[in-house]
């Protein structure tokens, strides 16, 4: 991994119920790796980021190479609370979508999932019932020269187009700062009920929204963001 890298950083993501001293673990990993390579620790913009991810059932080890800013998709329109681009890529990778396959985001917002997928060589389809968001996605795609298909329609359109995509990656709207009148927990319940059974799935939502849901066949992980927001990711 570090053969041609001059710099690296270690990052630990704890999705388990165990408590860890994450800064101490990251420092220990960095010290250990430094002893076996010529690469040096660099906290900002390293050549390689090494990840250790803990969950209650299994642990994951991996790495990501430095992404040059000029090669990343650009946005001319963005909005508060939209999905972080790095987390979007994590979700796409977690369900194993490959180049040439197609991802669908039924709550595409300003198009983060579509932009990141296209930049990874994955085709994309987006849905959003909000005309303003639909237009924002269209403008952002056009700016980057991407040809993703987008529909100004409700998420229930998934049922009609399920044969056109291989997986779903989305961040459900929270109700706050959106034009949705229906309660977010009701949206989540209805959304889960229509999910195609044979598709790869990564869904993110606020933890408390799905506390009472039956989630057969879906793995659940939680990411603590700050004291007032813990997100749940469902993976299939």
Language-model regions: role of each:
Residues 4-7, 100:
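Phosphate-coordination loops involved in phosphoryl transfer and adenosine-cofactor binding
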Residues 15-31, 38-236:
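Class I S-adenosyl-L-methionine-dependent methyltransferase catalytic core
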